[in-house]
Amino acid sequence: IPFVTYEEDRAGFKQSRADHTYGYSDALADGVVRPVMFMAYSGEARWRDSAGEEHAARLGEPLTAEQTARAWKTALNPAGEWMPAVIAAADTRLRGLREHVPDAGGMIIASDQTAARAYADLLRTITGEAPTVMLSDDKGSSDRISQFSAGTSSWLVAVRMVSEGVDVPRLAVGVYATS
C-alpha cells in the first residue's frame, strides 16, 4: 500500500507501522469518551422441559449449547426473577449517575418486540416513569431516537434498533438483554 511504512516482526513478517496512535485511554484523558464499565451478573436458572423434568444451570459456568440457550431464555424472561433484579440494579446505577449528570440515560436492548414491551412495563413499575420504546414497526420510531437523544428522560428500550452509528451521547447505562 503506498505511503505505508512496514517493519519486519520477529518472525520476519512485515507489519504496518502507525504514524500516530490514539486509543481509548487517550480519548478518555481528552474527555471525548465516557468511561466504560461492564458489570457482570450471575445467577441460577431453573426451568422445566416439555417432559416436565426440572433443570438448573448457573449462568457463567460451562454448559452445553442447549443448556446455555435454555438458561438464557429463562434468565431473560421478564416474568422471572433475574431480569427485574438486573433492571432495578441498572436503574439504581443510573439514578446515582444522574446526581452528577442530570440528563444521563439508560438503554435496554431486548431480543424481540414482546420482550421490549415487557421490559418497558418492568421499567415503568420500577421507576414510575414510562420509558421511550422504539420498535421498528412503530410509526415514528426513528424520530424517537432523536427526541430521546435531545431530551432528559431516563430510559430507552429498543430491539437492536439503536446500535453502532447511532449517536446518543447521554447514554450512560446499558442492559444488553439478549443472547
What feature does the model see in each segment?
Residues 17-19, 32-36, 127-130, 169-173:
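Short glycine-/polar-rich loops that comprise or flank the Walker A/P-loop
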Residues 110-135:
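Conserved helicase motor "Helicase C" RecA-like lobe of SF1/SF2 P-loop NTPases
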Residues 2-103:
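Interdomain helical connector at the RecA1-RecA2 junction of SF1/SF2 helicase-like NTPases
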Residues 130-179:
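Conserved RecA-like P-loop NTPase helicase motor core
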Residues 82-92, 115, 143-144, 161:
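Well-ordered alpha-helical segments embedded in enzymatic catalytic cores
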Residues 2-12, 123-126, 172-175:
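Short secondary-structure boundary/capping segments
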Residues 105-107, 155:
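Residue-level preference for the first positions of well-ordered beta-strands
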Residues 2-5, 42-47, 113-115, 138-139, ...:
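Conserved nucleotide-binding/hydrolysis micro-motifs of P-loop NTPases
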